[in-house]
Design a protein with these regions (language model features):
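C-terminal regulatory or interaction extensions
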Residues: 1-81
């Protein structure tokens, strides 16, 4: 599986098998601008089916976390090789 978006690859590697909040992902990536992160990392990863919400019916849930989908896990395993 090849993916051209390096931001999605980076996000998939960071999330891995964990469930992370936006704040946690920002800290690990080293970004400070939440809007930039959402527009260029998280939203494209969700739109392309690599990441999903822990509470999909409540996007603003106070304990919202993000995790990899099956497609995201497949990419994660490939990147770990």
């Amino acid at each position: 599986m090849h993916i051209d978006n390096l931001n999605i690859q980076k996000l998939v590697q960071i999330v891995g098998v964990a469930k992370l909040s936006v704040k946690e992902m920002l800290e690990v990536i080293g970004l400070k601008n939440r809007e930039h992160f959402l527009n260029y990392y998280l939203n494209p990863a969700i739109a392309n089916g690599y990441v999903c919400l822990l509470y999909p019916d409540k996007p603003r849930h106070p304990r919202q976390r993000y995790l990899l989908t099956e497609k995201g896990l497949a990419l994660y395993k490939e990147l770990e090789k």
